[in-house]
């Protein structure tokens, strides 16, 4: 019988790359060290508990918000720096190093995503993963494999606790 399990050294650099799981502590450090972070939020942030945490993250770390879908309406009276943009267009713009950003001060180095359906945000982050050096951190309830780093699959209670821990560490 031929042993086909030996010599498993890789000689290529291609293949599927997936995100690394991240703890709230590490995510907070990465967000704090980012030169130009952007918080990208989706329509799932219409949930009042999640919306409250989005506002706290933005205010605590002084991060502008890219509001996608119908999320801008809920942020209008929260005294945060939020701009509307289509999520797919933002994903496209983030791959362009010459894009001026939402505020005209240049492209971002780190994008934090929260409040999206898993199948949707994975498609948006696919371009950023494959065509840019952008660091993306998914602080979603589900594991997002096209992000650079992501929380694992969490229950709703654990997700809220992880977000609270992240806010405390920012």
Swiss-Prot record:
Which keywords does this chain's UniProt record carry?
A: Methanogenesis
Pathway the protein takes part in = One-carbon metabolism; methanogenesis from acetate
Which Pfam families has this protein been placed in?
CO_dh
GO BP terms: namely:
methanogenesis, from acetate
Instruction: Read off the InterPro entries from this record.
Output: CdhB, DHS-like_NAD/FAD-binding_dom
Q: How does it assemble?
A: Heterotetramer of two alpha and two epsilon subunits. The ACDS complex is made up of alpha, epsilon, beta, gamma and delta subunits with a probable stoichiometry of (alpha(2)epsilon(2))(4)-beta(8)-(gamma(1)delta(1))(8).
What is the role of the protein in this entry? Part of a complex that catalyzes the reversible cleavage of acetyl-CoA, allowing growth on acetate as sole source of carbon and energy. The alpha-epsilon subcomponent functions as a carbon monoxide dehydrogenase. The precise role of the epsilon subunit is unclear; it may have a stabilizing role within the alpha(2)epsilon(2) component and/or be involved in electron transfer to FAD during a potential FAD-mediated CO oxidation.
**Family classification:** Belongs to the CdhB family.
What is the protein named? Acetyl-CoA decarbonylase/synthase complex subunit epsilon 1
């Amino acid at each position: 019988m031929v042993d086909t399990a030996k010599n498993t050294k890789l000689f290529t650099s291609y293949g599927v790359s997936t995100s690394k799981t991240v703890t709230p502590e590490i995510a907070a450090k990465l967000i704090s060290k980012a030169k130009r972070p952007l918080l990208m939020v989706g329509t799932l942030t219409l949930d009042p508990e999640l919306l409250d945490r989005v506002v706290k993250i933005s205010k605590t770390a002084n991060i502008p918000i890219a509001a996608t879908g119908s999320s801008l309406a809920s942020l209008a009276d929260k005294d945060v720096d939020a701009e509307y943009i289509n999520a797919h267009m933002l994903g496209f713009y983030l791959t362009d190093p010459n894009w001026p950003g939402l505020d005209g001060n240049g492209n971002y180095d780190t994008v934090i995503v929260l409040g999206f359906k898993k199948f949707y945000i994975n498609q948006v982050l696919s371009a950023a993963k494959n065509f840019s050096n952008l660091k993306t951190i998914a602080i979603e309830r589900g594991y997002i494999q096209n992000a650079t780093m992501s929380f694992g699959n969490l229950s709703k209670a654990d997700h809220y606790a992880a977000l609270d821990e992240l806010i405390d560490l920012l």
